[in-house]
Amino acid sequence: MSDFHHISVMAAEVIQYLAPRAGGIYVDGTLGGGGHARQILEASAPDGLLIGFDRDREAIAIAAERLAPYGERVRLVQRNFACLAETLDEMGIDAIDGFLLDVGVSSHQLDTAARGFSFQHDAPLDMRMDVSSGQSASDLVNTLSEADLARIIWDYGEERWAKRIAAFIVKRREESPIETTMQLVDVIKGAVPRGAWDVRLHPATRTFQALRIAVNDELASLEKALAAGVRFLKKGGRGVVISFHSLEDRIVKTSFRSFAQGCTCPKSIPRCVCGKLPLVKVITGKPVMANEAEVSMNPRSRSARLRAAEKI
């Protein structure tokens, strides 16, 4: 089990902006291999509490093994981070000092062929972060209407050839179900005109991203977790989010700005009647990006964007 690998992105920056301290209560909404969690525990020694979430039971198991030396300072939960509010309520915790969300798929999930996240390996077309529940990517591509497939591929993948890819998927599944990653890759390659292939981007990249987001309801989960995290933050507590593509980053940016906004009454009204007060101040004017040294060691960090906000 110890072969679970996931390189913690922007580790120093996470600690800088989260600013963990002794006695604090911190939530890591995306445990992965436990790298960020371990750093938070070290920075909040000797008595900081870490509550870790992950949908992936393999990630939970390896995190439990790796974080065992921290004993009762660690509580692990196999749940979507969208369940943050109800989980904290169940634990009797009414406020936290910080939360971290490192969203998207982990290096381990991408590199484990059997999980079906990658277009580089032939495997069952699954893509579920929690393999014990929900519909797989294969279920979606074989049952959704052409219009729904096109909408998902466009909305979640920002793929310009979404309609054509959806049409090719429907045509192909009429012959036999699309059950593996390479079967889907072949369909996509046939749908996207070769002259439109980007030398820097595999033609299946955006479609695979879109299906993964749809299978795991990632964007709605992110919005829900952000709202809950900000609500539970103590004054001075911080939320840190690392995203890897524009859809996620847009949600984080918009959410933090909304939480930082006060009165929304029209300017024509002389006195505020909405009663809305700012909840946070955004402490990253622009998204923080991985430095050149990190990108050279971990190319996947190139697309990482970190944003942070502090409760006021």
Swiss-Prot record:
A GO biological process held by the record: rRNA base methylation
SUPFAM superfamilies: Putative methyltransferase TM0872, insert domain (SSF81799), S-adenosyl-L-methionine-dependent methyltransferases (SSF53335)
Subcellular location field: Cytoplasm
Keywords in alphabetical order: Cytoplasm, Methyltransferase, rRNA processing, S-adenosyl-L-methionine, Transferase
Binding of S-adenosyl-L-methionine, residues: G34, G35, H36, D54, F81, D102, Q109
InterPro entries noted in UniProt: RsmH, SAM-dep_MeTrfase_MraW_recog, SAM-dependent_MTases_sf
EC number: 2.1.1.199
UniProt GO molecular function: rRNA (cytosine-N4-)-methyltransferase activity
Pfam family membership, one: Methyltransf_5
Catalytic activity: cytidine(1402) in 16S rRNA + S-adenosyl-L-methionine = N(4)-methylcytidine(1402) in 16S rRNA + S-adenosyl-L-homocysteine + H(+)
UniProt GO cellular component terms: cytoplasm
Main location: cytoplasm
Function: Specifically methylates the N4 position of cytidine in position 1402 (C1402) of 16S rRNA.
Family: Belongs to the methyltransferase superfamily. RsmH family.
Entries under NCBIfam families matching the protein: 16S rRNA (cytosine(1402)-N(4))-methyltransferase RsmH
Name of this protein: Ribosomal RNA small subunit methyltransferase H
Gene: rsmH
